[in-house]
Amino acid sequence: MNRSTKTWPIALQRIAERALGEQAGQSLWQKYRAAFSAEYRALVSPRYALKDMLNLERITSSNNQCISLLNPGRQVEHYRLHFYSRQPRYLDEYIPVLENMHLRVMDQVQFSITVDGITLFIKSFTIKAKSQCASFAKL
């Protein structure tokens, strides 16, 4: 186990406790701490994992789907778009919608998260806006 693998859960715990208060943060962390795979931990920072946990809690209690846009920082020109659902989803369900929004999909991955015997899914896309310059070049 490398250092980042060991520190990721601790960072998530601290972020959850800071954001939600010690008791609520600790409770949420305990519920999800073993739910995230090594692949998820490698791709998603603890800061965004908290956002994912809160959205997964929403769909668990409401039986709806939701989405979240994650901005990785100032020096990065792409975003991560997470779709949360109670069943696995396929690319053909998302690509037409993303293309209609003039978004370019750079990659995608689906995570399955099992918490309290319920499996939930996060479909994660790396996206960026398509350049509109080409359409204006003819003017």
Question: Which role does the model predict for each range below?
Answer:
Residues M1-L103, V109-L139:
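Non-catalytic interaction/regulatory segments
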